[in-house]
A protein has these predicted regions:
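Extracytoplasmic
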Residues: 8-41, 113-117, 228-233
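Extracytoplasmic gate region of multi-pass secondary transporters
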Residues: 26-27, 208-252, 256-262
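Helix-breaking motifs and short loop linkers at transmembrane-helix boundaries and internal kinks
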Residues: 38, 70, 91-96, 241, ...
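Conserved MFS/SLC helix-loop-helix module at the cytosolic interface between two early adjacent transmembrane helices
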Residues: 57-96
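Cytoplasmic helix-loop-helix junction between adjacent transmembrane helices
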Residues: 101-139
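Intracellular juxtamembrane helix-capping segments at the cytosolic ends
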Residues: 111-125, 313-328
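Central cavity-lining transmembrane alpha-helices of secondary-active solute carriers
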Residues: 46-64, 252-264
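Helix-loop-helix hairpin linking two adjacent transmembrane segments in secondary transporters
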Residues: 133-186
Length: 389
């Protein structure tokens, strides 16, 4: 009965993951803004990186401030900023308001990432259910990432390419609904010392070997995600001479497989020990990358790209859950640290570019394999001693 009540209370929290996926409209919308205002390729290319930038600068400070604000209030703040960001272009559509809107969407998303995951632990106290719920959250976010751009295209279809921002009333209404639902749901506030925390207090947690390894684990799983998405289309073009239209199919296979894998993981992690699931998936991921490197067949390579997405899909949630369970009394700071590591994952892309430029496309796959090998070390080398809150 208690678990049933927890799951009902968790629904508005899980719905917040749908809002989290809205930031992915930045990529598709920036193309239309560029045409309207004549932005350079450099300026337009900078826009999507705003999501990573705010993770880097806000992860730890927001994690520290959550001790004062409370997790639920911090989530509500993130949604308020997101709504303001969506209103700006509707009030005044120009280059400046679009840049400010993108910044607010990035800030809101970063704050939401830091606060929503630990808020889930307020209502889901069972460790196996927590990992499964975090995975379910990633599924919901993935669905949102697919739906968001479609809403942009819907607005363009009805109102024209210069009115792409008419998608914001729909996305803003969904965000407002999410905020009202969460506000109306009673969630017991987490216990907090109320002490003022500094950046050094949070970074000191990395002296704990387990937390350090898990921090790097987040870094590298984001690296695997970014790397596979980045390299998949390039690999198909280089190896098989696929056209621009054809290569778009490779990332789609990856994202679809990742979504299916996360959905399956949400069910299996309730029944299977998370470490066992982690280990099996990492071994399968290594095998997929080795086949990708050694076999030159377009169908086999597409299957391998999808397999990497499938087998790596639940790893973020598993590592995040392990970190929260290792030091639950420091959950807010842990969340800030882990989200900061998400920003660091963007470093992997330049490394892949360097590897491709030096030794060819296989060098890029090898960088991805190195990331997976580290995660395999985490799967077999970390022993989390779960402590009580």
């Amino acid at each position: 009965m208690k678990n049933k009540h927890s799951l009902i209370t968790a629904l508005p929290v899980l719905f917040g993951f749908f809002v989290m996926g809205f930031c992915d409209i930045v990529g598709i919308s920036s193309d239309y803004v560029q045409r309207t205002f004549g932005w350079s390729d450099v300026m337009t290319g900078f826009v999507p990186s705003m999501v990573f930038i705010w993770f880097l600068f806000l992860g730890i400070p927001v994690g520290n401030q959550m001790n004062k604000w409370g997790r639920k209030n911090t989530v509500l703040l993130s949604m308020a900023l997101t709504i303001v960001g969506m209103l700006l272009p509707l009030i005044a559509y120009n280059s400046a308001t679009c840049m400010i809107a993108y910044a607010l969407l990035g800030i809101g998303n970063a704050i939401l990432q830091v606060s929503l995951n630990p808020l889930l632990s307020n209502v889901i106290t069972n460790s196996s259910l927590l990992t499964s719920s975090l995975t379910a959250g990633q599924v919901i976010k993935a669905i949102s990432s697919l739906v968001g751009p479609e809403i942009v295209l819907l607005a363009i279809g009805y109102f024209g390419a210069d009115k792409w921002y008419y998608c914001f009333p729909i996305l803003g209404a969904i965000t407002l609904l999410s905020a009202i639902w969460l506000l109306a749901t009673p969630i017991e506030r987490e216990k907090s010392s109320g002490a003022t925390l500094s950046m050094s207090n949070t970074f000191a947690l990395l002296k704990d070997r387990t937390i350090l390894l898990l921090f790097l684990g987040i870094f590298f799983i984001v690296g695997v995600d970014v790397a596979t998405n980045f390299i998949s289309s390039k690999l198909m073009a280089v190896r098989f001479g696929w056209s621009d239209e054809q290569v778009k199919f490779a990332p789609q296979v990856y994202f679809l497989s990742r979504t299916i894998g996360a959905l399956l993981g949400a069910f299996l992690l309730v029944r299977i020990a998370e470490m066992k699931y982690f280990r099996v998936n990492m071994i399968a991921c290594i095998a997929s990358l080795l086949v990708l490197m050694l076999v030159e067949n377009d169908i086999v390579n597409l299957i391998c790209i999808g397999a990497v997405g499938f087998f790596a899909s639940s790893v973020f949630a598993i590592i995040y859950s392990m970190a929260l369970q290792a030091r639950p009394e420091k959950a807010n700071q842990i969340s800030g640290l882990m989200i900061t590591a998400v920003a660091g994952g963007g470093v992997v892309t330049p490394a892949i570019g360097l590897a491709i430029g030096t030794v060819g496309i296989l060098g890029g796959v090898a960088v991805t394999l190195l990331c997976v090998l580290y995660l395999t070390y985490c799967a077999f080398g970390i022993k989390v001693v779960k402590t009580q809150k």
